[in-house]
Amino acid sequence: MAGMKTASGDYIDSSWELRVFVGEEDPEAQSVTLRVTGESHIGGVLLKIVEEINRKQDWSDHAIWWEQKRQWLLQTHWTLDKYGILADARLFFGPQHRPVILRLPNRRVLRLRASFSKPLFQTVAAICRLLSIRHPEELSLLRAPEKKEKKKKEKEPEEEVHDLTKVVLAGGVAPTLFRGMPAHFSDSAQTEACYHMLSRPQPAPDPLLLQRLPRPSSLPDKTQLHSRWLDSSRCLMQQGIKAGDVLWLRFKYYSFFDLDPKTDPVRLTQLYEQARWDLLTEEIDCTEEEMMVFAALQYHINKLTLSGDVGELASGDLGLDDLDAALNNLEVKLKGSAPSDMLDSLTTIPELKDHLRIFRPRKLTLKGYRQYWVVFKDTTLSYYKSQDEAPGDPTQQLNLKGCEVVPDVNVSGQKFCIKLLVPSPEGMSEIYLRCQDEQQYAQWMAACRLASKGRTMADSSYASEVQAILAFLSLQRAGGSNGGSGNKPQGPEAPAEGLNPYGLVAPRFQRKFKAKQLTPRILEAHQNVAQLSLTEAQLRFIQAWQSLPDFGISYVMVRFKGSRKDEILGIANNRLIRIDLAVGDVVKTWRFSNMRQWNVNWDIRQVAIEFDEHINVAFSCVSASCRIVHEYIGGYIFLSTRERARGEELDEDLFLQLTGGHEAF
């Protein structure tokens, strides 16, 4: 028993004194001194600490933090010897859940209690559960950017901070609905207002504030954002986060699974807001026509939100709608397909055959587009000088599996081009296809996109891909104005109530156009979306965002093995992209589907990847830790394993196996 003494007061056992500070990591904090042995269990030490403090309160959330090892002592049955704790250990007895300030994708601020002792993956899952966001594996936390000191100190506007620190959810129990919202949000007017902030789009930002926000001016600037992601396998305490720190909650992985407007109002709104701010802060580029479409959708969404027409379904209707959908699905399954139709679908390989104009950029050439007879079959594109030569050898044949597909479209100028970057031994071979009209462009663009992923036009998603492309093009078409009306919008939209165009477009368009030039163009584009409901408009905005060439690419500055210059590595949900830092051109693309394995050498901070056909790639990271690249690759592979049948069940162990690392503190 610890603390045995002789008659003179000397200790005769192997016990020793252990000092534990009470509270958070403060050298001035109150401390207690305990008499322990190496065989003392952590649970017994916790009990002694509470007895020494001698204060009645709920201590169930408290645990011991070992400062030198940056480790929580959570295994209460372990002894001090097993942990390796000696008398010089700096230990702190404090709460595991502490307040943090979150800046959400909609740029609003929220204060809540988060776990500082669990891996970040679990912490984010708990935060998303509190905020009613499904599929938390798509999100993560990143550090807020450091504020630069300004020569002239400006008073920053005060922000409303929604407080959820007192909201506690029972573990393992799904939140119930009450009055159309999760029950824990209906406790007070403040929490109800917080739910409306989460689930409803925010008004357009102040144009002056928008101009003052930092914006990336180059690819290296875009790499800075992705250097701030926190490690998913470590807790907040291990990463130097303190109570009250500001963190950003963002969608990290651009692979959105089972997005259902009925069950995902918060997730849908926050995803829309992240897309909107990506465009407004120029994190992602778009053309002038596309910006007008995005501005028109924002204007429409803002109008519906302000009018209160948020399209909420009554709780009684929700079950009926679900029942109708289930019956419709059952009807489709029961109808099935005729045996002859199924046989045709198995034996017939879809093809595209048509005249297209083709251009292959080469050095020291002035040749432009030339017309060819083009045949698209499986994932292969072949072109001939004329239709008569088609059965013979083609002028050139290209396998588009693993290629980059980039749209080059100007609807008003009737320009419908597809830029293909096809992998070749020398790098990426560039070729342009010019289509005659929207219908032809949509069919060939959809075929190219599927082929780049190794899929053919027989894939069930081909028809929906064509329709999505046509829908996006229709948004960019000028609204139904009569001849000569030009820039004068007709109907109730003419006064443009509440329309400040500078709050709807990126700053580079603010500099290029005056407000009186932007307003009629936005209203003209608005005529194409004026009939959409709020949910439909948000979904259309997200779909248009997803169709942009640079969508879903996270940038990291790296140096490839054997190279003397820095380059950019783009990470998407299905591929890695090597980009020339000087000109921004794609040099090479590697598909995850062709990847055999990847390894990280934490000592020299190098990532090595092996692909099919004995292709090996190795690089060191310059702008961020190699852990971030490792986690992106593992995270996207994990997300590709999700299945609808499993619902929202997550294999956390698999995620941590794919993304966890052994980098030293």
From Swiss-Prot:
Disruption phenotype: Mice suffer from fatal anemia, caused by severe bleeding and erythrocytopenia. Mice also show markedly reduced size and cellularity. Platelets cannot activate integrins despite normal Talin (Tln1) expression. One of its GO terms (biological process) is integrin activation. Residues 357-453 form the PH domain. GO terms for cellular component: anchoring junction; cell projection; podosome. Signal peptide: none annotated. Specifically expressed in hematopoietic cells. Pfam families: FERM_M (PF00373), Kindlin_2_N (PF18124), PH (PF00169). It comes from the Eukaryota. The modification Phosphoserine is found at S8. It is found in: Cell projection, Podosome. GO terms for molecular function: integrin binding. Residues 229-556 form the FERM domain. InterPro entries: Band_41_domain, FERM/acyl-CoA-bd_prot_sf, FERM_2, FERM_central, Kindlin/fermitin, Kindlin_2_N, PH-like_dom_sf, PH_domain. The modification Phosphothreonine is found at T589. Plays a central role in cell adhesion in hematopoietic cells. Acts by activating the integrin beta-1-3 (ITGB1, ITGB2 and ITGB3). Required for integrin-mediated platelet adhesion and leukocyte adhesion to endothelial cells. Required for activation of integrin beta-2 (ITGB2) in polymorphonuclear granulocytes (PMNs). Interacts with ITGB1, ITGB2 and ITGB3 (via cytoplasmic tails). The FERM domain is not correctly detected by PROSITE or Pfam techniques because it contains the insertion of a PH domain. This is Fermitin family homolog 3. The lineage of its organism: Eukaryota, Metazoa, Chordata, Craniata, Vertebrata.
